[in-house]
């Protein structure tokens, strides 16, 4: 339906000609009914919850520690994206180096900020190595989060995060297709297509103190849901 769609034209074109083609190809499509967007409001998570999910098709367990965080248009969501990069963005990141490379406690570990329109999810995902227990992985992940909450990251690590943010932004907008995709995303999910000109400045303005404070605000044990995804006998 036209009233639930976004059309982006990017590249070298004449505006009057583009409008004529848009009208020619899409103008006859009728408008649909009005769309009600009444999203439920969720109560804050104030105590830890744990659930088990068995799957007969897997051989190794996986553990998910997830937290509800702000929607992707909020400034704190940008900070959480930098936190996820610091903790697990690449083989030199804190959690990968500690749990996978050095201590061989995990086959895989990730920290992901999944930005969504209203609320987001920040989640740690870990697959244990050998007999490593969930409690051990949870303790080690919590310890790294605690460091973030109480100690400012180094200038070197902070500069790396800034470099990653700039590199990701440039790469995603280095082609006409990428620019069109970004414009659509910013308009539909953020309500502001002009973020294509301003989002990088948001990342550049984030401070080490904000990283500490946002970790302290959202990544606490009483604010999470733990999912144990475990093998189940057939």
Segments (PLM) and residue ranges:
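A common structural junction motif
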Residues: 25-33, 103, 142-153
């Amino acid at each position: 339906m036209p009233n639930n769609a976004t059309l982006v034209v990017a590249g070298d074109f004449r505006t009057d000609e583009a409008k004529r083609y848009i009208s020619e190809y899409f103008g006859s499509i009728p408008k649909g009914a009005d769309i009600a967007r009444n999203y439920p409001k969720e109560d804050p998570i104030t105590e830890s919850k744990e659930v088990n999910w068995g799957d007969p098709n897997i051989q190794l367990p996986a553990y998910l520690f997830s937290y509800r965080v702000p929607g992707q248009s909020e400034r704190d969501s940008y900070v959480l994206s930098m936190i996820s990069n610091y903790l697990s963005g690449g083989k030199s990141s804190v959690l990968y180096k500690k749990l996978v490379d050095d201590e061989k406690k995990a086959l895989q570990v990730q920290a992901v900020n999944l930005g969504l329109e209203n609320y987001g999810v920040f989640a740690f995902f870990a697959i244990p190595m050998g007999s490593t227990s969930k409690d051990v992985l949870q303790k080690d992940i919590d310890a790294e989060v605690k460091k973030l909450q109480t100690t400012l990251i180094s200038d070197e690590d902070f500069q790396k995060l800034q470099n990653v943010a700039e590199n990701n932004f440039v790469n995603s907008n280095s082609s006409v297709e990428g620019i069109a995709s970004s414009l659509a995303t910013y308009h539909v999910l953020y309500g502001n297509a002009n973020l294509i000109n301003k989002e990088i400045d948001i990342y550049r303005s984030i401070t080490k103190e904000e990283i500490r404070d946002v970790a302290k605000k959202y990544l606490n044990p009483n604010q999470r849901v733990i999912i144990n995804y475990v093998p189940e006998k057939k």
